[in-house]
Amino acid sequence: MKGRDKLLETIEGIPLLRRQTEAALASGCPVMVALPVSGPRHTALEGLEVTLTTVRDAAEGMGATLRTAALLAARHAPDRPMMILLPDVPGIGPFDIKTILNRFEAEGGDTVVRATDDAGRPGTPLIVPPRLMESFTRLTGDDGGRSALKGENVTKVKIANSRATTDLDTPEEWAAWRSAQGIPD
C-alpha cells in the first residue's frame, strides 16, 4: 500500500475498517474487533458499540488475530458462534452478513458456514460453531484458520461476483475497484 493502511482507505469518506464494522453491527449481533496496539485504526472505530481487544503479537500473523478474537469470544460468549469478517474485503455488506447468519441458523447451528465467490473460492465472512472455538484459540503464525477447520464439513454460500474474495492490497487495486463501483477517489 506504499505506506498507507488499507483498513483506513476510505469509501465515500468512511474508513474501510469503520464501514465493515458498521456492516457487522447492522446484523444485530455483538461485535468484537481484534486490532494491534492503539492507533489510527482504534480512532476509526470511536463511537461504535463494539468490544475492542488488542492483538499484542500481531506481527505473528493472522493466526494471532484469530486466536485473540477466539479467546475473547470464548470468554464473553462461550455458547455462541463466532463470525469471522475480515475487514479488508470491501464488497461485503450487511445483507451478506445476514445471509451467512441465516444459513448458519438454517443448518442447525453446528456447521461451519462460509461465503464463497461465484467460482467457489472460500472467502469472508464465515461463521463457526462454539465447539470449534478451542481450535481457534490454538492458531499460530499466518494460519487464517485452515488448521482449525481441517476435517470440518463446510456449508458454502455463494455471494455474487467476487465480493467475498476481493481483497485490495495496492493503491492501484483500490483505484480500479473504486472506478468499477462508481465511487470517486
PLM region descriptions:
Residues E134, R138-D185:
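Conserved alpha/beta core of the MobA/IspD/sugar-nucleotide pyrophosphorylase nucleotidyltransferase superfamily
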Residues V89, T124-I127, T137, T165-T166:
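A residue-level structural signature of the nucleotidyltransferase/glycosyltransferase Rossmann-like core
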Residues M1-P122, N153-I159, P184:
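Nucleotide and nucleotide-moiety/phosphate-recognizing core
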Residues E9-E12, M133-T137:
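Short, flexible loop segments at the rims of nucleotide/cofactor-binding pockets, characterized by
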Residues G123-E134, P171:
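Conserved nucleotide-sugar donor-binding
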